[in-house]
Amino acid sequence: MARTTPLERVRNIGIAAHIDAGKTTTTERILFYSGVVHKIGEVHEGNTVTDWMVQERERGITITAAAITTAWTKRDPQNPTQPMPGALEHKINIIDTPGHVDFTIEVERSMRVLDGVIAVFCSVGGVQPQSETVWRQANRYSVPRIVFVNKMDRTGANFYRVYDQIRDRLRANAVPIQLPIGAEDTLRGLIDLVRMRAYLYKNDIGTDIEETEIPADMQEQADEFRTKLVEAVAEADDVLMEKYLEGEDLTEEEIRAGLRQGTIAGTIVPMLCGSAFKNKGVQLLLDAVIDYLPAPTEVPAIQGTLPDGTEVERKADDAQPLAGLAFKIMSDPYGRLTFVRVYSGILKKGSYVLNSTKGKKERISRLIVLKADDRIEVDELRAGDLGAALGLKDTFTGDTLCDDSAPVILESLFIPEPVISVAVEPKTKQDMEKLSKALQSLSEEDPTFRVSVDPETNQTVIAGMGELHLEILVDRMLREFNVGANVGAPQVAYRETVRKPVRTEGKFIRQSGGKGQYGHVVIELEPGDPGSGFEFVSKIVGGVVPKEYIGPAEQGMKEACESGILAGYPVIDLKVTMVDGSFHEVDSSEMAFKIAGSMAIKDAVMKANPVLLEPMMKVEVEVPEDFLGSVMGDLISRRGQIEGQTATEGIAKVTAKVPLERMFGYATDIRSNTQGRGIFSMEFSHYEEVPRNVAEAIIAKNKGNA
């Protein structure tokens, strides 16, 4: 089957932002104007296309990254409600990502497979902590982006304040290509700084737009920002810079070409504005997606590794060997959906592919593309396409799918560690079986959701990125899998580490008639770098310990560290060097060395000044200034460290680092402390040593439970 849309006319984009910036509404309007839906969905009515899970519709937030395919033809500048004569249709694959920090993995995995992003900002709230997180994720994968300043109809809307915040807080070269005409309830149109024309909206559904002169009272401001736009474009291109310095005007085509070049290179971030809810600015936003965001052929070719370790790249080309990345798993009435971004080659229905990450062959039974709740079966996915495959049993998030004849492994995803856990217990024997199925299915879908069994209590423990994350997963267990379960109170994911180097040994000898047991290791332990986990090095020479016993000794140490030594929490950031030992020709065994390794590490950790670490959260609180004192006092009482405060138009913003252990239930507390007028956001920052008095209480409690 031939390609229906040339690669140059494909856009793979994400819509990302902080919670409540209006991403889902923006997506709904895009689907409405591009003809995917014929009735506008509203978040507050719970009938949007991309929020299709029950939990999403109830809470009015997006949890999973919904993938949708649509099409757009550029509008006629003289009549923006109609396609431009002679313009060609573009295919747009859109991922609507969640803004709540507990669902960061959804943003992370969508950034990995996108070519461009629309970053949506609220014109009132501006740059929020989650905006910074999303921006960092886009930076990590060098994703070009355009900005849409939304909610310009809201009280307190200020386009220019958001412009300053993006430049100052995100250190981005934001370049407005539009200015709003009016704001709040007087928002009536937009100025196009590329064409230097105005668009006035004559109705509230965006179907009657008049192209006209720039209002006289805004001409000076428009000229000022037009100059900034031309300067930014000239800086992105030497030829345009030369023309600009010689005093010549740049044409519309040159400005667009320079903006495109700068956006794709990451040196320019075009800024647009409007109100998705009031249907203003959406068609022009879609035009900007086509004008400024890259096609799959315009981003760097995906990097991969061959089986022999050689670095290789795969270009976006149907003729190249197949290379695709599984970026999401989802349970569905259709079966297990594996979302795939095809980077090169063609993925065909009914074909066998190699999962090079696992070294296993898989059969693609069916392929579908999604329009949220609608699943459309297709015969193939080509280079640059996003879609979902059915029939894959061993493929998980981050795995590479490729041709068996041309194996390659693509770079996987960055997956953050969970910071909060709860114990779950099935209510009945029947629930026990259902619970294990539910947990397996949910952990396949979400790599930040971890399941383990506490060896002391035999309880099943689930861990995730925050209270809301676990709350929604437990809710899904009850609703989708019909599991009756009792859920314990949230527990903090503490860690243990060491502060000084030591040398010690572990010797396991058992003689009780017949074959004995003998294992002996000598180790040096030292603190590792933050984030280094458990590092093991063997410096055994001369066969003092045979090679076949070094692995089991390491395994014994690793398992002891995973179980915890000081208070039962995993030991991290330490380097262990095995320097000596001894063995017995007859009595030594792998098990004896595993036990000796475990004994050595336990002794070493207890002698190396062990400490407890706790997750610290970056907390940002916004409250009316009248409540500032009580909110700051409350944060300090939670062992918080205040890092900064600002005030704008009667609203105070406080940033602090606070231990996660002291933030449980904070959502309820801040509501009662501020008469329901305070809001806060929280994300994981780093691990920090627990104060001695607090640590002693935690250790004593854990030893009492043992």
Curated annotation (Swiss-Prot):
Record-linked InterPro entries: EFG_II, EFG_III, EFG_III/V, EFG_IV, EFG_V, EFG_V-like, EFTu-like_2, G_TR_CS
Compartments it resides in: Cytoplasm
Pfam families from the UniProt entry: EFG_C (PF00679), EFG_III (PF14492), EFG_IV (PF03764), GTP_EFTU (PF00009), GTP_EFTU_D2 (PF03144)
Disulfide cysteine pairs (residue numbers): none
SUPFAM superfamilies per UniProt: EF-G C-terminal domain-like, P-loop containing nucleoside triphosphate hydrolases, Ribosomal protein S5 domain 2-like, Translation proteins
Superkingdom in the source lineage: Bacteria
Gene3D superfamilies documented for this protein: 3.30.230.10, 3.30.70.240, Elongation Factor G (Translational Gtpase), domain 3, P-loop containing nucleotide triphosphate hydrolases, Translation factors
CDD domains: EF-G, EFG_III, EFG_mtEFG1_IV, EFG_mtEFG_C, EFG_mtEFG_II
Biological processes annotated in GO: ribosome disassembly
Start and end residues of each tr-type G domain: 8-297
GO cellular component entries: cytoplasm
Record's keyword terms, sorted: Cytoplasm, Elongation factor, GTP-binding, Nucleotide-binding, Protein biosynthesis
Role noted for this protein: Catalyzes the GTP-dependent ribosomal translocation step during translation elongation. During this step, the ribosome changes from the pre-translocational (PRE) to the post-translocational (POST) state as the newly formed A-site-bound peptidyl-tRNA and P-site-bound deacylated tRNA move to the P and E sites, respectively. Catalyzes the coordinated movement of the two tRNA molecules, the mRNA and conformational changes in the ribosome.
Protein family according to the UniProt entry: Belongs to the TRAFAC class translation factor GTPase superfamily. Classic translation factor GTPase family. EF-G/EF-2 subfamily.
Record protein name field: Elongation factor G
Organism: Cyanothece sp. (strain PCC 7425 / ATCC 29141)
Gene from which this protein is expressed: fusA
